[in-house]
Amino acid sequence: MKSEDYTYARMAPDIHEERQYHCEECDQLFESKTELSNHQKYSCGTPHSAFSLVENSFPPILNDDSDLTEMQHAHECKECDQVFPDMQSLEKHLLSHTEEREYKCDQCPKAFNWKSNLIRHQMSHDTGKHYECENCSKQVFTDPSNLQRHIRSQHVGARAHACSECGKTFATSSGLKQHKHIHSSVKPFVCEVCHKSYTQFSNLCRHKRMHADCRTQIKCKDCGQMFSTTSSLNKHRRFCEGKNHFTAGGLFRQGISLPGNTAMDKVSMIGMNHAGLADYFGASRHAAGLTFPTAPGFPFSFPGLFPSSLYHRPHLIPPASPVKGLPGVEQSNKSQSLHVNQPQVLPATQDILKALNKHHSVDENKALEFITENNLNQRPHEKVSDHSESTDLDDVSTPSGSDLETTSGSDLESDIESDKDKLKENGKLYKDKISPLQSLAALNSKREYNNHSVFSPCLEEQTVTGAVNDSIKAIASIAEKYFGSTGLVGLPDKKGTSLPYPSMFPLPFFPAISQSMYTFPERDVRPLPLKVEPESPKESKKVQKGTTESAFDLTTKCKEEKASPNAPSKSSAPTSSKHEQPLDLSMGSRSRATTTKQTESRKNHIFGEKKDIDSELKKTSEHFLQHARPAPFFMDPIYRVEKRKTMDPLEVLKEKYLRSSSGFLFHPQFPLPDQRTWMSAIENMAEKLESFNALKPEANDLIQSVPSMFSFRASSSALPENLLRKGKERYTCRYCGKIFPRSANLTRHLRTHTGEQPYRCKYCDRSFSISSNLQRHIRNIHNKEKPFKCHLCDRCFGQQTNLDRHLKKHENGNLSGTAASSPHSEIEGTGAILEEKEDSYFNEIRNFIGNNSHNKQSPLNIDERINGSHDKIMLTGQNSDILDDDEIEDEAILEDDEESDIDVKVMKEPNASAMLKNCSDEFEEESKSEVNCKVSPSRHDDDDDDEEEDFKKSLSALDHIRHFTDSLKIRKMDDGQFNDAELSPFTASHLTDDLKHPLYRKSKSQTYAMMLSLSDQESMHPTTHTSSSMWHNLARAAAESTALHSVSHV
């Protein structure tokens, strides 16, 4: 019904007219009384209206339809220009403006309650960085991504991303992608506790936080700590410093007792399997009575790189070896009741037993031994022979974390408690059970064993375990990193005298070296306990008095007493010049005068000793050990930590200077280098390294107990308890129990539980829990920074990883037309890398020689020596002192390490090797005396054969490594074979640019090697050579040689 057709008078009566309520103030009609009352209370301009003052400022409300747009503006806030559909919404909004606004804009009078609103408002003043919405002009965004998000969610395309399976719509594609995981049947993320699976990793992490008591499900067998998942347990095992790695259930077997552990007390445990090693290296492969593990020393097949069950490892000790006939060994395997009528301990175990019990009183040690003897008699034989009878099933290795391992701490507690009770009752009954005859019999059996054994005592103690095979992988990886991946080849076994120090490589690698080469006194071989109770001063003095002159005394003594810490035998009289003090590993000062007199007595100690032997020998010999000493626990090379301050200097030397070359370590067809030169050089280097304070721990508390063959980190048993447990409880998560090495890692981890994201982006609404993620977000998203530029195609990237991925495409040739595709650029790039590496290598050699040189006259420049300039030749030989033997031998080690790299480079370029042949022949002249240096060149040609023989005798220590035959062929060639015409192709004018740089590097390497060999020759003939004659000869030979001139010119 239209209004113009009917007037009020003619309009049909409305049936709802009687229910309309009329407002007397504004003549509006309402259908209900409540609407009228609300109208009069708020909207109408009556005196009772709460907002009459606000409405007075508005324009009058008109009933015409043409003024509806003006009515909409009546609900607009004057403070922030926001429009509201009704007055009630506007009134609620006005309450927010009554609060105090502390954030004011410096460009306009507006103020805000929140700093984020102020920042967003200030961006609107910057005309270059604001983005307005076309649909709602009031909306201004500081980032285009926020504007696009606003358009998708509020305007066209809102929730435009629909799921094809269920029809559910999403505003973003990421939301749809996350939703589609619900419909997927693949759930790869499984909870390791309750085995519930999830499609997303974030849901699994959220679920794992819900487990409150999951920490009691998975327990670490080494330290007893609880974990919620096996992955966290495996991660914990990599850094586990638990003490049970080195206790009876760990690396050791029957009868071992380590101090400082409450679960595995000082009482010996019988019949324990290798639970600690089984997780990492598989089951052991030796009988219960043998001293050695049966892993090969350094096998050709290199089984340390593979699981232990893939290779059959033969026994170290042959079946006919006298080791199996030792007293007490066969008895422990045959007799059912193990009576200790004669010493059953293997000789290699007595030193470590004494070291393990050094911090306890004599009475406690004797009582401990008595309990061990009673345990051997009382326990069933099945438990003792359990390990030896299971050798047929040893090839089945136990996986890490499996339930097949049966050793647990709870199984041992009952035995420990009973042993403690017996210790209290029978502790005082043991004093009368040891007689000097039994102690002497134990000593004699040890000496007889040492004389008839295939291996020396030092090598017997340094046994090869699975951990050593694991450490060989690390050595191989280091050698492969520096020198290639050709491999190592062992040598035939040498059944001569033993090494007087722990072998660098296992048994078959070293030849027979005399005992007098390397003897250090006053070293402390005692392993430091994890936790010991302090003794009273009186008791410690009594123990030290009673054991000062006793055998196998490893207690700490004053340096003035010159006591041997692990001598095989020692009389009660003071140490004489005929008695030997074997390898001493303490960090204290040495007296070299005493070491030279103690070199020939080890083989003579059989029966002729005095009978005044302390009863502690019997006490220590009653223990039944399988391993000679605690070996450190070896982890993968990635997780190893080098503790150089706790390493012995000899170990540092062996790791630094005795690395293999790119080929074989020692070629099996040639004899090994001169032993005396080698060992004296190492000895001197060890003394020099000990002079640095960096290798001296404070108060000798961190000295490694026994030098291992490959000591990448100190064993846990050699460190005090306070250092092992330091920080373990400090950085522990209170929610899940995880342990972190640093507080920052714990703080970051706690945010995963609390959900805190304190780092908020100032440009958008995103928040981050890690500040680095926020910085990366601002740099890549908002600032569009691309600081990483490709030097080949000038492309820029925001992250280094993207640039690296791009450079790999250049290397693979996927990007054509680049500089990397040309062969010259590749040669120049590799040449620059090699040249930089060689320069740093030679700088290190040059600094080392300069530091150890004692010449009063400074040496000439090396380049000037090579060029052979006559105006700078050293002619004052009388004023320049000759290097002593020790320093020359130190340089010989550096020469050996260098020549191992040079030989490989020379073999790759036979022409370069022939070019440098004359240089080696001319350097042979310098092994002659000063008189012979003045002979005419014709006399020089006649004496080439004699000089060649002298040079062969003075070969340096490592000239027998790979390519030794080729280097000899080069040296055997006469000087007359090459004339100037034949050498002309090697001059600088005939060389191409591609060959100049490699030839120059090789010539420089050869020159350094030959200069160092001169010092080695001088050490071999100290009476017939002087430094002045050598350098004079070098300059004269260089001047006469065309090849050397050409090399110098290059």
UniProtKB/Swiss-Prot annotation:
This is MDS1 and EVI1 complex locus protein EVI1-B. Residues 397-411, 588-598 have a biased composition (Polar residues). It is found in: Nucleus; Nucleus speckle. GO terms for cellular component: nuclear speck; nucleus. Pfam families: zf-C2H2 (PF00096), zf-C2H2_6 (PF13912). Its main location: nucleus. Disulfide bonds: none annotated. InterPro entries: Znf_C2H2_sf, Znf_C2H2_type. Residues 564-576 have a biased composition (Low complexity). PROSITE patterns: ZINC_FINGER_C2H2_1, ZINC_FINGER_C2H2_2. It comes from Xenopus laevis (African clawed frog). Transcriptional repressor during pronephros development. Plays a role in regionalization of the pronephros; may promote formation of the distal tubule and duct over formation of the glomus and proximal tubule. The CTBP-binding motifs and the N-terminal group of zinc fingers are required for repressor activity in the pronephros.
